[in-house]
Amino acid sequence: MADLELETIGRVRLARLNRPDKKNAQSEEMLDLLSAALREADEDPAVGCFVITGAGDAFCSGGDLGRRSKEQEARDPTPLERKERLAKVSQRVARAVELFEKPLIAAVNGAAVGAGMDMALMCDFRVAGASARFSEGYIRVGLLPGNGGCYFLPRIVGMPKALELLWTGDFVDADEALRLGMVNHVYPDAELMTRTLALAQRIADGPPVQLRDIKKLTYQAQHTDLRTSLESVSAHMAVVQSTEDYKEAIKAFKEKRKPVFKGR
């Protein structure tokens, strides 16, 4: 049984972390498969949105510390080897996400801890089941947030709260995560995937070029001034107004029907 299951539902690609007996602790196979799935979905015109969730009653409990301990007992790696392994193995999904141009959603069921919380944070947004719990638990095992926690968390909840959560490793339940802006919606556990997939499908049904441009422009705007952002939007606007999908949207509006977008 593979450590990651993939399913296509309409225009949504669903990736399910699949080590439920280990609370979906990350394995090298899982990270390999997920990073490859992201690259493939980004190139597939039939995919409009990507959703990550976990099998069983957990989203992801972080890295597989048991497996890591056995490997280190067999051979103690040098500091350089540790650094290179972190970059090439543990961080490969974060690097794939950085290049992913389509909408990316985390559907958090149960616990998201350490690298599991980081995986949720690196998505464009998160929705949660009522039983979801989040913890940057690295501090409890003497580690640093190695998969983007120091980068993503302050941008979502602000620096003071991020530092508190990183320093303490405290758990945040679903309602508190909603209050902090860590998740956009909290659904009953039994409805999490149905409602997440409905939302993902609504997004995926949008015009593909415009979806990608909105994501790119919104992220770029976090690192530039207003004038530069407006100029960039203007340049992209000139392009999208020449697309068939723009013309289809205007025609559908006039005809009072749902537009059919083709990504061109």
PLM regions and their residue ranges:
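Conserved CoA-thioester-binding segment of acyl-CoA-metabolizing enzymes
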Residues: 1-55, 71
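Charged catalytic carboxylate motif
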Residues: 29-33, 89, 96, 195, ...
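Glycine- (often His-adjacent) and acidic-residue-rich active-site loop
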Residues: 54-96, 112, 225
